[in-house]
From Swiss-Prot:
Protein name as it appears in the record: Urease subunit beta
Primary gene name: ureB
Keyword DNA-binding: no
GO cellular component annotations of the record: urease complex
The entry's keywords: Cytoplasm, Hydrolase
GO molecular function, a single term: urease activity
Length: 104
């Protein structure tokens, strides 16, 4: 074995398997491009993006880590979102949640 060497099994790796998803239509009503990263809490994206924010609460883009989606001015497109996992706590971003997503 070489230090740092990985032994990978044959087959496909399915991202976000068995996680809740939602598909939303998103429009950029602004005058500048808006780019959203893979792990940004979609509910808290730029207000110029128009979509059903309630359905996006606790969700992020269902894309590979480290990638992003760009919305040009006037552009509309459908995106697939996936539920955040782990503790389901959100801090930062635009400060609209600042705590647990699932209130007990």
């Amino acid at each position: 074995m070489i230090p740092g060497e990985l032994f990978i099994q044959d087959g496909e790796i399915e991202l976000n398997a068995e996680r809740e998803t939602a598909t939303l239509s998103v429009a950029n009503a602004g005058d500048r491009p808006i780019q959203v990263g893979s792990h940004y809490h979609f509910f808290e994206t730029n207000p110029a993006l128009q979509f059903d924010r309630a359905k996006a609460r606790g969700m992020r883009l269902d894309i590979a880590a480290g990638t992003a989606v760009r919305f040009e001015p006037g552009q509309s497109r459908e995106v697939q979102l996936v539920a955040l996992a782990g503790k389901r706590e959100v801090y930062g971003f635009r400060g609209e949640v600042m705590g647990k997503l699932d209130k007990a």
